[in-house]
Each structure stands twice: as structure tokens, then as C-alpha cells.
Amino acid sequence: MAETLEFNDIFQEVKGSMNDGRLRLSRQGIIFKNSKTGKVDNIQAGELTEGIWRRVALGHGLKLLTKNGHVYKYDGFRESEFEKLSDFFKTHYRLELMEKDLCVKGWNWGTVKFGGQLLSFDIGDQPVFEIPLSNVSQCTTGKNEVTLEFHQNDDAEVSLMEVRFYVPPTQEDGVDPVEAFAQNVLSKADVIQATGDAICIFRELQCLTPRGRYDIRIYPTFLHLHGKTFDYKIPYTTVLRLFLLPHKDQRQMFFVISLDPPIKQGQTRYHFLILLFSKDEDISLTLNMNEEEVEKRFEGRLTKNMSGSLYEMVSRVMKALVNRKITVPGNFQGHSGAQCITCSYKASSGLLYPLERGFIYVHKPPVHIRFDEISFVNFARGTTTTRSFDFEIETKQGTQYTFSSIEREEYGKLFDFVNAKKLNIKNRGLKEGINPGYDDYADSDEDQHDAYLERMKEEGKIREENANDSSDDSGEETDESFNPGEEEEDVAEEFDSNASASSSSNEGDSDREEKKREQLKRAKMAKDRKSRRKSSEAKKGKDPNAPKRPMSAYMLWLNASREKIKSDHPGISITDLSKKAGEIWKGMSKEKKEEWDRKAEDARREYEKAMKEYEGGRGDSSKRDKSKKKKKVKAKMEKKSTPSRGSSSKSSSRQLSDSFKSKEFVSSDESSSGENKSKKKRRRSEDSEEELASTPPSSEDSASGSDE
């Protein structure tokens, strides 16, 4: 038989709201920890008197009764877990776990039974419903009616406001059944009645929330705040935690009382009661009890006469009456030596206190965040002009808290504190405009594998390559229309005609030099474009026969473990699967990772070997291709070098232009159409006719003409 039993996702009903938590059964007793509030129920094994198993709305439930009349109910068990629990109760608690069914007839008449702190409405021997009397806030009576009103839970979507019972009259003389019913309820109900004298009174205390000065009257079961406008009665059972926090100026102290449910002022709810004290203010306090009562009730924690600082007296009395520890700041010390950090939350500035088990911010609005609620924290820069940073906290429920305007000098201390508490740090990247000097705020999760991020990087690379390829393609279209050989011919044709009478030889020489320089410049630009085009074609023309790159150790492990993760988490999405795999990989030990590192190393060696073989084979084929290309180019050059028929002036100009032709132009693609060639022939014939018309007659012709 196991020494302990643990159950997750167990629910406890708290004033109409179902709070999940974790239940642990051991030989010493039963412990339930509320996941939302962190409150712990500890039931000693010797206090248990009865255990009941029954069907409820959330599966099956466990009802436990103790010797002092307390009742604990936990729901969310499966039917198959009954035998395991029954054997555990018999072995360790010597109790029989009884099965009991609820009545579902739907009748509205029956018998009311009071047992411990429960009111049970029964039909026959079966209970219909039960009301915890500690949830009753008010009990009023009528002629034949009793009305119960309840404390409200702000977290409950639907709340039960009141229940009204009709109590029929009886024939017994001297007994009022309505009054008897009401007295049974009031004896166990959490109804605040300021009867008797207060144990002590603190006058005119400064309260930050709710704002004002209040007289605090301490009663045995509740705290009474009496102000000029409002009165609050706070039962000690609603106090969750107590905090005593030193102000940054070292002259004041905060005393914070965490409440659940909160006190209300109109539509405003106050989850925290914050008192502000001066360290220099002292008080002498006398309790309104005799010494024997003080000793018996508080067991040495308080004495009848006490004196000291006002904040010490208030905190000491509250600790004794509420019976809860006072939380103080831990070992954290900021840059200025204080145990807190000055920052802003929402629209107000305040103080953030790093505690041993959480963070608390005071005072407007006060915020308390436990470490077990935190999903991750983040350090981020606010703007470029301020020397400050933001500290962000996101809870597991998705709520985000941003504490801004923290001095840069506090960064190191806060970062070390967060690391020491082993909180997850997720840096979302520094905001735009950050100086290079702020690299201190780099992400601490560099080693964490993010499959989604890697996939996005790969897609970005592919898009960038496609963009480059498309730009190169557009460049090729413009390059094809640029044929340097043809342009040179056009330039040469401008000088085909013999010098006209109006042009000088010097001007012609200078024009030729300028044209030559321009042609050289164009040739160089074309060569650069062609080289860029070739490199882009090499990128595009990826050989499908080339060896594939080896996978990393993580990817090898992921491919082998993907099906197992899917089976362990049925219905998981692809994104969540990658995220889950990254978490599992990060949590793996070095010994387990070494196996996949070896496989990755073997794959890398095989890739390098295959790459060498592939490069060797590709080198031979490329050499053959190059020799073929050289032969083709040589043949074209020989073909072009043969002198064309025509006038001597035209051939000389053609030779001049050919002297500036590069190898690239000689081997350019033969894209000139026959139509362009015919146009040029017609243009050359017209030029020759113009030359004949414009040439002056020779001396011999003129002489013969004169003779005629």
C-alpha cells in the first residue's frame, strides 16, 4: 500500500466558486492547496471522524467531518478511484469510507437537520442540499419564515443571494419553531455582531486604501474600521495574508492586510487594507482582558500591557488574532540600499517589493503576485530618452503586469534576484531605438530551442532569395536590349562620309575620343551586369542531386519522438507540438542529449564525404562544358574577324569599332533579326548616294566642262 496518494485537478467549492487545487493524502493527514489563493487546508489524521463518498456535479466527491465540527468537501474524483481511497482510509485512518447518494426527487419539503457547521435539508434519509453556516451573513425571521443571506464571492459567475424557509407552527407550548430555527443558524453563522467591549482600540490611523483616517477596534472575531463616512467590519476568517513593508525613505512603514472576499465601498472593492505608520510614533497599549484570559487565549504571544512603536503593536495584535505569519521583505537589496524598487504601475508611481515567494506593489492599486502564479517575466526598455527599463510579469492565467520607469541601476540586482528564484525570463526584444550599450538586457533564453522561430527565419531567407532572383530577371530583360556590337556599328557609320566642308579634323578627333570612352564605360557596365546575372543563375540552379544538409541533434530527436509526443498529448496542434518538444529538449539531461549529438556528428561526416564526391564529379563536367564554350567563342571570333566587302572608309571605321570590342561582345547572343540588318543596308546605300551628290567635281572634270 502506498504511503501517500496525490490527486490533481480536485475542486473545492468556496461560496459558489469552484477553485481547483491539489489534494495529498498521507499517513499524518490530508492537505489541500488552493491553486488560486494558495490557501492550504491541513486536516490531521486524528481529527477525522467520518468520510463520505458521493456522486456530485463534477464526477464524484469526498466529504470529510472532523471532531470540532468542521466539514471539508472536495469534488472531481473519478468513479474508479473509490477503491483506492477506501483502502487508504481503512489502512491509515481506521475509517470506513461510506457511499451515500443525494436525493434528486425535486421536492421542496422535507426535514432540516443541523450538524456541526452544516444545515442539511433531507427527504427521508437522503440529503437534498447542504448549506455551510459559515457562509451565512444575515438571518432574519418573519411570521412563519426564516431568511438566510450569504456572503458573496466576486469570482463566482452566479451567486446565491438568499434562501427562504417556511417553518410550520407546532402544537408545543412555549416553543417558537421559527426562533429556534434562527438561533441554530446564528450559533454557527458568520454574522458580525459587535457585542461586548473591544479588546483594544487604535485611534486615527492613516489608511491609504480605503483612503482616510479610521479608528480600528479589535474584537475577538472581527476587525471594525470606523471612519467619518464609512464603517467596515472585517471577519478574521477573510484575512489571507499580512505584510509589513519598510518605506524607501526608511522613516515610514506599510502594514498590508490581504482580504478575500474584499470590503466594498459602493461599487469599489478593496482587496487590500493598507495602513501607513511613522517609525517615530510610539504607543502604550492595555488589552481589555485580565491577564489569565490573555495568557489562555494568546499563549504568550500578547501580554496585557505592551508598549513600543505603533506599527509594531498593530502588527503584533493582528498576528495573534488572525493567527497568520507576517510577510516581510527577504534578502533583496536595491541599488540605493532599500528593499524595494521605485517604479510606476498604470498611472501611478509606487514601490515594488521582491519577497521570498512573490512580488507586492504598493500602493495604488496594490498588487500581489505569487511566484507559483508566474508564467514568465520580461525585461524591456521603454524609450530612448529615459535611462530606465520596464519589468513585465505574465501569469499562467494570461494576466500581464507592467512595472515601468525603473532606474537602469536596479537592473542588475533585479535580474540576479529573478535568476536566483528560477523564474522563466522571456525577453521579447528591446524596443526600437535602443543604444548598443544596452545589450545587457539580452535574452537569457538563448539556449532554448524555438522551432517556430527557426521556421520563420527559413521562410524569410527563401522570400529574400526569391526577391533577389526576380530583380535579376528584370535586369536580364534590359540587358538583352543592349547590344554593344550594333551600337558600335551605328557610331562608325556617322564617320562613313568623307569630311564635309564645314567640319574640322580636330573636332572629329575629339568626338571620336569621347565616343570611345563612352563605349568602354557601357561595355564595363554590361560586364558587371552579366557577372551578377551568372551568380544569381548559380543560386537559382540548385542541383537536385546535391547531398542534403545534415539535420541537427534536436531535429533528429524530434523526428524520432514526434509520434510519442502526439500519443502523450492527443489532439495537440503543430505549433503546440513544436513548443512542447522544445520544452522537453531543454529539460533533457546531457547524457541523453549526447546520443543525439553523436548521431548528428555522424550525419555531418557522411554529408562532408558525399559533398566531396559530388564536388569532384561536378568539377570534371564543368571542365568539359568550359572547353566546349571556348571552342564556340573562338569560332565566332574567327568568323567576325574576316573583312567584309564595302568601301575603304567603311571598312576602316568597322576596324576602329572592332578594336574596342571585348570578348563578351564577340560571344554575345545572335539576337539581331534580319529586319534590323536590312534597315541598316538601306541606310548605308542612302548615305553613299548623299556622298556622291555632295562631293565637288575634280579639276579634270571642271577643265573638261570649261572646254565644253
Curated annotation (Swiss-Prot):
Residues 470-496 have a biased composition (Acidic residues). GO terms for biological process: DNA repair; DNA replication; nucleosome assembly; nucleosome disassembly; regulation of chromatin organization. Residues 497-507, 643-659 have a biased composition (Low complexity). There is a cross-link at K90, K296, K364 (Glycyl lysine isopeptide (Lys-Gly) (interchain with G-Cter in SUMO2)). Residues 547-615 bind DNA. The modification Phosphoserine is found at S444, S471, S510, S657, S659, S667, S668, S671, S672, S673, S688. GO terms for cellular component: FACT complex; nucleolus; nucleus. One of its GO terms (molecular function) is DNA binding. The modification Phosphothreonine is found at T170. SMART domains: HMG, Rtt106. The modification N-acetylalanine is found at A2. Residues 625-634 have a biased composition (Basic residues). It is found in: Nucleus; Chromosome; Nucleus, Nucleolus. The record marks D450, A451 as: Cleavage. The modification Phosphotyrosine is found at Y441, Y452. Coiled coil: none annotated. Residues 458-708 are annotated as: Disordered. Disruption phenotype: Embryos die soon after implantation while preimplantation blastocysts are defective for cell outgrowth. Its main location: nucleus. Residues 512-546, 577-624 have a biased composition (Basic and acidic residues). Residues 695-708 have a biased composition (Polar residues). Interacts with MYOG (via C-terminal region). Component of the FACT complex, a stable heterodimer of SSRP1 and SUPT16H. Also a component of a CK2-SPT16-SSRP1 complex which forms following UV irradiation, composed of SSRP1, SUPT16H, CSNK2A1, CSNK2A2 and CSNK2B. Binds to histone H3-H4 tetramers, but not to intact nucleosomes. Identified in a centromere complex containing histones H2A, H2B and H4, and at least CENPA, CENPB, CENPC, CENPT, CENPN, HJURP, SUPT16H, SSRP1 and RSF1. Interacts with isoform gamma of TP63. Interacts with FYTTD1/UIF. Interacts with SRF. Interacts with NEK9. Belongs to the SSRP1 family. This is FACT complex subunit SSRP1.
